[in-house]
Amino acid sequence: RGIWHTAEKFRAAGRGSVSVAELVNELTRYFEDKKSFAEWDTPENQLADTLPAISRSNAWVAILNEMVNARRGTSLVSMGVLSFEYRKNDEAVLGFQDAFGLEQGDARALLELLAQDAVYSGAIDAGKDYTLTSAEREYIFFAPTAKKLVLLKTAENAKKSWISGWRGRKRTNGNYYPNSRMSRLMRALGLSEDDADALLCDYWENVFEAETEEFSLDANDFRINIGGLPSSKFYRCKKCGRITPYNVKNQCSSVKCSGVLETYDPLSASEGNHYARLYRSDRADPLYIKEHTAQLAKDQQTAYQEAFVQKKINAL
C-alpha cells in the first residue's frame, strides 16, 4: 500500500524512473507521516527518536519483498504500478544486441529477465544501506539465513537450500540438469546448451562481476520504472495471462509457456481488482490488538483497559 501511494506521487510528478534509494526515502516519509509502525505505548515526545529508523527498516523490507515476489499475480509489477531494471545491464546491451542480431528492446528485456531470475532466487539484499534481521528474512524469503548465488552448484553444496546455482550443472551422464536461464537463452537466441551455459558464465563475470564465491545482488543496483506513464510498457501473454514489462520477441516471460505477448495496460485493468482496491486505500494507520486474559498481571490489565478507553489500543 505504501509503495502504491509512493509510486502515485512520482507518477503525478511525471517521474518515469527513480532509484531504489529515492523510493526507500519517500516510502520512509510516508510511513512516518502515517505513524504506520509506531508502538502504541511510545510517548508522543519520543516518536521522533524511534519512528524514522523503524519506518526506514520497514521501507526496505517492503521494497525487497516486492522485488522478490514480482512474479505474483497480486504484485505491483503485475498490476502495472512499477517495474525493476538492473542498472548493470546498461553497458551490456549494445554488445549483446550486436552479438546476436537483436533489436535493442529485445536485448535489454532478455538481460533483464536474467537479472530478475537472480532476484527471484532470493539472493538480494540492501547492500551497505541496511542489514535485514533474521525475522525480516524469514518474512521475505521464508528462511532466516541470507540466500546466495554461486556460479556452479556442486554436489558438495547441493543440500544447502540457501544456495542457488547460476550456470548449468551436468549430471554424471553429461546431460544438464534443468536450468530456466539456459532454457530462456536457448529459446530466445537459438543456442545449444553448451553455448547458453557459456553465455551465463560470461554474464556472471562481466555483468554481476561477482568478487566472491557466494554472491548476492544489491537492490541499489536497480532502478524503478514507474507505470502509468507513456514511457512504461507492459505485456500480457495471450495463453497463460502472465503480465510482464519484459518483451523478448513477443515470447511469454515464462519459459514453461509457449504463448505470445500482447500490449496491455494492467494499471487501468486493475481498477476493479480486489487487491488494487486494498492498495489504493489511504488507510495506513497501525492497528493495535492486545490479549486481555486473567493470566495477565493486574497492573498490565489496567494499562490495557485504560489504553483501550483512550483509543490507543483498537481491540482487546
Please give the residue ranges for each predicted region.
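SF2 helicase motor core recognition
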Residues: 315-316
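Helicase motor interdomain insertion/brace
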Residues: 1-312
